[in-house]
Each structure stands twice: as structure tokens, then as C-alpha cells.
Amino acid sequence: MEFIDLAPSAHARGAVQLPGSKSISNRTLLLAALAQGETQIRDLLKSDDTDRMLEALTSLGVTLTRTGENDYHLVGTGGSFPHKEADLFLGNAGTAFRPLTAALAFSGGTYKLHGVPRMHERPIGDLVDALRQVGADITYLGQEGFPPLLIKPAHIAAQGSIKIRGDVSSQFLTALLMALPMTGKETHIELVSELISKPYIEITLRLMAQFGVEVQRDGWERFTVPAASGYVSPGTVYVEGDASSASYFLAAGALGGGPVRVQGVGAKSIQGDVAFADALEAIGVTITKGDNWIEASAPQLPLKAFNRDFNHIPDAAMTLAVVALFCDGPSRLTNIASWRVKETDRIAAMATELRKLGAIVEEGEDWLQVTPVPTLNAQVPIDTYDDHRMAMCFSLATFGGVPVRINDPQCTAKTFPTYFDVFSQVVS
């Protein structure tokens, strides 16, 4: 197994230009593909997840051209993919798999969607159930409720109301919202359970509006996609920096004194994960913001222990689980059940690896409590479970004054292929 050995860190200072947001990148690619007109996409994230979406769109007959290092030109299909038969390998990219499932269910073709073994363990049944309510023909090729899937042509009767759960993954609602304009019918979506990760739905709604579709919502329980609401290209779309990726560098600024500035997200960001900066501020970190940047510094450690609900920022919350090693008492992360159905079971994985470092960790179905210890265990090999965020989070353990070995560091290619190079430039 490949690994990277990280030296102990004492200081962090500098500025980081963030890679593009994964959530915005893959949503924008699909919307541009479904739209009328041609779209220039600037600052797209270069990663495994976006590569899988680009490959899928190409297989579906979308004309796309790379025009710069992170820039693309897409010719929209007007809501109908040219190729009516395709076999799509989507890796472990939930931001590609879920939205494409919905879009292809309305596309009148025969499509097989599959991925890596972990993708076949990630639930999709709630989305499939919702799509079947309007007539979609979707078959499970393995275990009921999970990928891989076979989609066949079907008569879609989208008028009326679709019921869907919101407490497993917000990507199911995102997928429905993005695909329903393809039907041309007014459709209502009703949530039958609490919606998690609401900020990710905000991203979806804002991007849909940018492409000309205004979804009406009644609180977070009911959404209406208007009739005759096809997508129209806005011309050029700029992708924000990834706010989840910002969390590691803001935390480094907190643990290493700082200041560390992230560029590409700021006070005007549409991403909910910028709230990570507020969570840091609440435990004693000095945060300053501009329209397109955030900066973190801290005069001294330890930081304040916390007990906080992270339902709205589950990805960035992982970073705080490692930051908890440097707090002045037990810290508790709650309402994080969605961690269990991500790239790995993140509650179990985080608990296992924090214990290796010496922390006292308790876990429940939807919570994690971390009690720090005076001295971390040195030269601990951290397993990453093919999960990019596990690898990036545990780089912060080096601020405990110990070397840390990260196994399979290349898993960061999912969202941030150059992460460890950039991290090494701001820490010392």
C-alpha cells in the first residue's frame, strides 16, 4: 500500500487557492448538458468525481470540449440526450450517480449505471421509489435498494405529487429537482421526513435558477417545479472554490497560529460549508471574511470544547472531529447519521483512527464524542478507507507534534488531487 509520512507541524501560514467545488461542478455539468444553448464553464474541479461525470456525458452524446486547464465548453442537448443506450461507470461519485439516475429515467433510453464496490453499498432506494411514482422503469441489478441499476424507456406521468424521504441523503432530492424540468409538467415534491444537509439543496436551487428554472418551495417540506420550465444556458458559469476543502486549511490556521487564507469562497458563497468558519469562531478561532476569501488564526491552544449539531454541514464537520483533539475537554458532534452512508461509514472510520492516536472516542448511530489526551501517539498509520476526507482530515493530527503516516494518500484525487502538496506549503 502506498503511504505518505507527514512531519510534525507547529505553524501554519499562507494563502491557498481552492480547487473548484465538487457539488457545484457536477451540478453545473449536468445542467449545461440538459440546457438549450452553449455554456462556458470556468474553474471546474479536476477530480475523479468530475471525470466520471464528464465521461458519462460524453457517452450520452453531449458535445464538450476542454478549452483551458479547468475550463470547458458544452453544447446543450435541450433536455434530450442524443445516445439512447449507454453503459456508465460512475466510480464512487454520488454527485454523478444520483442526478444521472433521475435524468436518465426521463430520457427514454436504456442505460446501465454502476460503480466501485462501495458505490454499490450506498443506498439509492428512496430515489428509485420516487422516480417509480411517476412511471420510471428502473431495475436493481444487485441488492434491492442499491446500485447497480438498469434504466429502460418508460412513459413518465410527472403531473401531481412525488413523495420522497429527506433523511438519508439530500442528493436524492437534488436529483429529482434537477431532472423534473425535463418532463415539462408542473410537479410537486413532498418530503416525508426531515431534510438533512439543507445547504446542498440551496446550491441546487440557485444553480437551477441560474439556468432559468425557478423552483417554488414551501419551507423545506414541499417544492414545486413549474410546467414548461426547460433549462437555458446562462452563457458562462464560474465555479466557486470548494468550501469543504477550505475546512482543512482554516483548521490549520487555527491549530498552527495562522493566519491562513483560503481564496475562492467567502461571505458571498452559495455553499453551506462556509459555516465551518462560524463553527471555528465559536470555539475561539479568529475568523475574517471578504467576498471571496476567509482567513483563520488563533492566538493559542487549546480551543474550546464543543457540543454542536452538524446536520447542515456533515462533510466539513469531519474536520472538526480531528480539531477536537486540540480542545480543552470532550467535544460532541451530533446529528451526523449521514456519515454512515458516505464514501465509507465515516463515524466508524473516524472513531477507529482517532483511537489509534490515543483519543478517547464514543460513538452512537448519529453522534461522535472525542475526548483529547495530553500527548498523541506518534507515527501512527492512519487508514483512509478510500475516503478522500479521511485522508485530508488526519493531516491535521500533525499539529499534535507527532509524525503521522497517511495510507493510500492518492484517495484525495476524488476532490483535491494536489492536497498534500498544498498542505506542505502552508505548514512548518
Swiss-Prot record:
Pfam families: EPSP_synthase. InterPro entries: Enolpyruvate_Tfrase_dom, Enolpyruvate_Tfrase_sf, EPSP_synthase, EPSP_synthase_CS, RNA3'P_cycl/enolpyr_Trfase_a/b. Keywords: Amino-acid biosynthesis, Aromatic amino acid biosynthesis, Cytoplasm, Transferase. Disulfide bonds: none annotated. Its EC number is 2.5.1.19. The keyword Nucleotide-binding does not apply. The keyword rRNA-binding does not apply. One of its GO terms (cellular component) is cytoplasm. The active site is at D315. GO terms for biological process: amino acid biosynthetic process; aromatic amino acid family biosynthetic process; chorismate biosynthetic process. 3-phosphoshikimate binds at K22, S23, R27, S169, S170, Q171, S197, D315, K342. One of its GO terms (molecular function) is 3-phosphoshikimate 1-carboxyvinyltransferase activity. It catalyses: 3-phosphoshikimate + phosphoenolpyruvate = 5-O-(1-carboxyvinyl)-3-phosphoshikimate + phosphate. Pathway: Metabolic intermediate biosynthesis; chorismate biosynthesis; chorismate from D-erythrose 4-phosphate and phosphoenolpyruvate: step 6/7. Its main location: cytoplasm. It is found in: Cytoplasm. Phosphoenolpyruvate binds at K22, G94, R122, Q171, R346, R389, K414. HAMAP family: EPSP_synth. PANTHER family: AROM/DEHYDROQUINATE SYNTHASE, PENTAFUNCTIONAL AROM POLYPEPTIDE. Catalyzes the transfer of the enolpyruvyl moiety of phosphoenolpyruvate (PEP) to the 5-hydroxyl of shikimate-3-phosphate (S3P) to produce enolpyruvyl shikimate-3-phosphate and inorganic phosphate. Monomer. Belongs to the EPSP synthase family. This is 3-phosphoshikimate 1-carboxyvinyltransferase.
